[in-house]
Design a protein with these regions (language model features):
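TOPRIM fold recognition
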Residues: 1-2, 45-54, 216-301
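N-terminal structured subdomain of primase-like DNA metabolism proteins
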Residues: 1-82
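Terminal peptide-recognition signature
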Residues: 47, 60, 112, 149, ...
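Short active-site loop/helix that positions an aromatic residue
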Residues: 62, 209-218
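Intrinsically disordered, low-complexity linkers and terminal tails enriched in Pro/Gly
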Residues: 78-92
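Basic, glycine-enriched DNA-binding surface that flanks or lies within the catalytic cores of DNA
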Residues: 90-194, 218
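Short, catalytically relevant binding-site loops at active-site mouths
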Residues: 168, 207-209, 231-234
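Short active-site oxyanion
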Residues: 196-200, 282-284
C-alpha cells in the first residue's frame, strides 16, 4: 500500500483523462472544478467545496467510484510514475494573548450564564481545564474583551484558539466578533473529557458542546466531547485516531502524522479492519439538522 501511495497523482489523473492545469509551482487545478486541486509536493489532492481530500488511493476511489481494494489493484497493475513526496510540517502555534488574559473571567462568566444559559458549575470546569479564558483583543484602534476557547492536542499542547466578542457590535455581520487566531491548527478541535473516554461526541462549536453537556450530563460517562469549530472531517479523523492510539498506548504514532494524512488513515482503518463494526457507538454527531449538517453526516457515513 505504501508503494502505491508513492505513485504520482498527476500521472494517475492524466491516465484517467483529466488534465489538471498548473496554477503555481506545485498546485494544479481541475479543468472543470476550480476548487479541486492537486498538490504535487505532497502528492495529495483536496476538493475544497466538497471538503474531500486525500492521497492517490483516495483520488482513484473518488474519480472511478470504486472500493479501496479495487483502487489498490488499479494502481498496482498499471506502470505509473513515482513521485518524490515532500511532507509539509506545520509551524508551532503561537498564542499571543497570555499577558492580556483576565484570570477572574468575570465578563466571560456573565456572558455564558446570562446570554447562553450555561451553568456556573460547567463554566468553572472548563476554566479549570484551561479550555476557557477571558482576554483583551485589539482590532484597529479598538480594544474589547473576548472569550477565548482553547484547543489542546493529545500531548496537552496548545494548538489553536477561537475568539468570540462578549459585547455586541452591530457593525459586524454576526453582531459579535468571531475569529480564529492566526496559525491555529484547526484539525485538533476543542475536547473535554468525562471519565475515561471510549467514545466521541462531536459538536459544531464550543458553546454547543457546553450546552450539550448541560442537557445530557446525567447520562454522560467515559466520553470525550469535541467541538469541531465548524464542520471539519479532519477533526473527526484526528480525535478518532487519538482515541484508538490511547486505547493501544501508542500516542507517539500521532506525533508523526501530518494533518493531510488524518482522513486517509481513518478511511484505511474503516476499509481494512473491523474496528468501526466492533465499536458501533464510537461516534455521535450532535450537529445542526440543517443542509450543512446533513451533508456533513452523509460524508462521514
Amino acid at each position: 500500500m505504501e508503494e502505491c501511495k508513492q505513485i504520482s497523482i498527476l500521472d494517475v489523473a492524466n491516465r484517467l483523462g483529466i488534465s489538471f492545469k498548473q496554477v503555481s509551482s506545485s498546485v494544479y487545478e481541475h479543468p472543470e472544478h476550480d476548487s479541486f486541486r492537486i498538490f504535487s509536493t505532497t502528492n495529495t489532492f483536496k476538493w475544497f467545496s466538497r471538503d474531500i481530500q486525500g492521497d492517490v488511493i483516495d483520488f482513484v476511489r473518488l474519480v472511478k467510484g470504486i472500493s479501496f481494494k479495487e483502487a489498490l489493484a488499479f494502481l498496482s497493475e498499471e506502470p505509473f510514475q513515482k513521485e518524490a513526496i515532500q511532507e509539509k510540517r506545520e509551524r508551532p502555534f503561537y498564542y499571543p494573548l497570555k499577558r492580556v488574559e483576565d484570570s477572574n473571567c468575570s465578563l466571560t462568566r456573565y456572558y455564558l450564564t446570562e446570554c447562553r444559559g450555561i451553568s456556573e458549575e460547567i463554566i468553572q470546569k472548563m476554566i479549570q481545564q484551561g479550555l476557557i479564558a477571558q482576554a483583551s483583543w485589539k482590532t484597529n484602534e479598538t480594544v474589547e474583551p473576548v472569550n477565548v476557547f482553547k484547543s489542546f492536542d493529545h500531548r496537552h499542547k496548545l494548538q489553536a484558539a477561537s475568539l468570540q466578542g462578549i459585547y455586541k457590535n452591530h457593525s459586524l455581520p454576526r453582531e459579535r466578533l468571531k475569529t480564529i487566531l492566526k496559525g491555529s491548527h484547526g484539525h485538533v478541535g476543542i475536547s473535554f473529557d468525562i471519565g475515561k473516554p471510549n467514545r466521541l461526541v462531536f459538536c459544531e462549536s464550543f458553546i454547543d458542546l457546553m450546552s450539550y453537556y448541560e442537557l445530557h450530563q446525567q447520562n454522560l460517562f467515559d466520553v470525550r466531547l469535541v467541538s469541531m469549530e465548524g464542520l471539519k472531517r479532519s477533526v473527526v479523523a484526528y480525535q478518532t485516531l487519538r482515541l484508538i492510539a490511547e486505547e493501544n498506548q501508542k500516542l507517539e504514532f500521532l506525533d508523526t502524522v501530518i494533518p493531510s494524512k488524518l482522513l486517509p488513515l481513518m478511511n484505511t482503518i474503516r476499509d481494512t479492519t473491523s474496528y468501526f463494526d466492533n465499536h458501533p457507538d464510537l461516534l455521535t454527531l450532535a450537529v445542526d439538522c440543517d443542509d450543512a449538517g446533513k451533508d456533513f453526516s452523509d460524508k462521514l457515513s
